């Protein structure tokens, strides 16, 4: 069975999904990125299934190599953008924890509301 055209098409689909994920990450559309992840995983599984059935010829491998390199490059860029986002979220969580600690330590002052005053004397 010659599945070369189907395999090539599957790789093209994976490239498109990879480019979409990179665009979403670049635009910081995190919810959409996460939603698109399953389609990407399914496309990878489809390619794995096709290559298990019949190994691609050397010629086909040479044709697919540029697509693979593009996908790997996109994946690396997406991972970098995700790491930046995770660092931002970790910083926000840290700030939130500090605020919670401060409120817990100083918030209950025997029913008195602590507020700065313009004139102390």
From Swiss-Prot:
Keywords: Bacterial flagellum biogenesis, Chaperone, Cytoplasm, Repressor, Transcription, Transcription regulation. The keyword Transmembrane does not apply. Residues 1-50 are annotated as: Required for homodimerization. Residues 60-98 are annotated as: FliD binding. It is found in: Cytoplasm, Cytosol. Signal peptide: none annotated. One of its GO terms (cellular component) is cytosol. The keyword Repeat does not apply. It holds the Pfam family FliT. It comes from the Bacteria. One of its GO terms (biological process) is negative regulation of bacterial-type flagellum assembly. InterPro entries: FliT (IPR008622). Belongs to the FliT family. Homodimer. Interacts with FliD and FlhC. NCBIfam families: PRK10548.1 (NF007836). Dual-function protein that regulates the transcription of class 2 flagellar operons and that also acts as an export chaperone for the filament-capping protein FliD. As a transcriptional regulator, acts as an anti-FlhDC factor; it directly binds FlhC, thus inhibiting the binding of the FlhC/FlhD complex to class 2 promoters, resulting in decreased expression of class 2 flagellar operons. As a chaperone, effects FliD transition to the membrane by preventing its premature polymerization, and by directing it to the export apparatus. This is Flagellar protein FliT.
